[in-house]
């Protein structure tokens, strides 16, 4: 169980309309606003669900997926604009939860005895990895007996045209890379060595457990009510699970991996920024710039005319070569300013005016 408690930090969120109502010279000045707000705390109870498959082995493999999602978006995180709608979260993360159940059924029928299996369905992931963070602080088995943690988060949107699967955490054990590459089968694997990331494997990595996170990529329906079951690639999910099974079978006979700390490429030298453009980047894109996989309605990008499939090449005076330079450019933007956004669209360079 995890009971969330409120902090003593006051938080204020301003809508674009609220910002527009402020004096134009307010930002950058030393003026102060007096605010009167009423705060109502809501306590919720969330539960992790665990199943232990005891094979009488000294070490245990953890397979995990988070089963929570956004509900009606009342706790934040939704990219939907308009009347509240239920967010079913088919890809994020019913796909991973279904994969967890399928693997539990599969291994229950096998005679694998090198290690035990612990199947974990986490809650509270969308609110900040709460379920997995709680588990590693209150584990039901010694963490030093864990072989590795495999995390399935958004495995339901494999593209048939590329069959590209993201595997994160490949730098957390010396043994990972040869296995990840050689066992790919029909899949094209895009690796990320970092053990950190915005999913539950991070909680285990921070406890010196080797991890792998399986991820088929972002899409326009991410954190929207349209993330529904009819948009999942079920044959693709099967390919992902078969790949995970091959990896499990290839684990060392003694059930020990050489854990390694990794460079946190996601957070290293990341600039702080106050603004958002309102795009969903294509994290599998390997070319110049930042490819747009989705555009959030009502945000600056959408209002400027940015389209899904565009590739961002420049923002104001900044050149955008990759995600790092994009974030640097975003950090250099100012509220209320209008700048030129350069995108590549269907082979041509298009200049748009975006206002923050």
Residue ranges and their predicted role:
Residues 313, 328-356:
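PDZ-domain C-terminal substructure recognizer with occasional recognition of PDZ-binding tails
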Residues 2-89, 102-105, 109-114, 137:
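Soluble metallo-hydrolase cores and metallopeptidase-like ectodomains found primarily
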Residues 204, 296-310, 329:
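PDZ/PDZ-like domain micro-motif
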Residues 114-122, 149-152, 251-271:
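Acidic/histidine-enriched alpha-helical segments
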């Amino acid at each position: 169980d995890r009971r969330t408690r409120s902090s003593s930090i006051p938080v204020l969120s301003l809508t674009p309309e609220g910002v527009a109502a402020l004096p134009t010279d307010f930002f950058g000045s030393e003026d102060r606003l007096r605010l009167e707000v009423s705060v109502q705390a809501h306590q919720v109870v969330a539960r992790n669900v665990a199943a232990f498959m005891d094979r009488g082995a000294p070490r245990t493999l953890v397979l995990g997926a988070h089963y929570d999602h956004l509900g009606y978006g009342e706790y934040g995180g939704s990219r939907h604009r308009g009347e509240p709608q239920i967010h079913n979260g088919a890809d994020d993360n019913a796909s991973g939860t279904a994969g967890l159940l399928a693997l539990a059924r599969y291994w229950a029928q096998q005679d694998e005895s090198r290690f035990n299996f612990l199947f974990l369905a986490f809650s509270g992931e969308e609110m900040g990895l709460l379920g997995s963070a709680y588990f590693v602080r209150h584990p039901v088995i010694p963490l030093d007996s864990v072989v590795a943690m495999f995390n399935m988060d958004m495995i339901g949107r494999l593209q048939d045209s590329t069959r590209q699967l993201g595997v994160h955490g490949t730098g957390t054990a010396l043994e990972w890379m040869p296995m990840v590459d050689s066992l790919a089968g029909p899949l094209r694997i895009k690796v990320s060595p970092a053990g950190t990331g915005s999913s539950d494997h991070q909680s285990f990595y921070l406890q010196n457990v080797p991890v792998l996170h399986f991820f088929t990529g972002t899409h326009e329906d991410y954190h929207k009510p349209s993330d529904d079951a009819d948009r999942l690639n079920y044959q693709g999910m099967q390919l992902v699970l078969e790949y995970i099974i091959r990896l499990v079978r290839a684990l060392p006979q003694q059930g020990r991996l050489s854990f390694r700390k990794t460079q946190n490429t996601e957070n290293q030298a990341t600039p702080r920024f106050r603004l958002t453009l309102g795009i969903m980047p294509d994290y599998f894109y390997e070319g110049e710039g930042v490819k747009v996989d989705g555009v959030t309605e009502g945000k600056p990008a959408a209002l400027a005319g940015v389209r899904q499939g565009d590739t961002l090449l420049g923002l104001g005076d900044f050149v955008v070569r990759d995600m790092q330079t994009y974030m640097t450019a975003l950090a250099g933007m100012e509220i209320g300013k209008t700048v030129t956004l350069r995108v590549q669209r269907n082979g041509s360079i298009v200049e748009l005016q975006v206002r923050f």
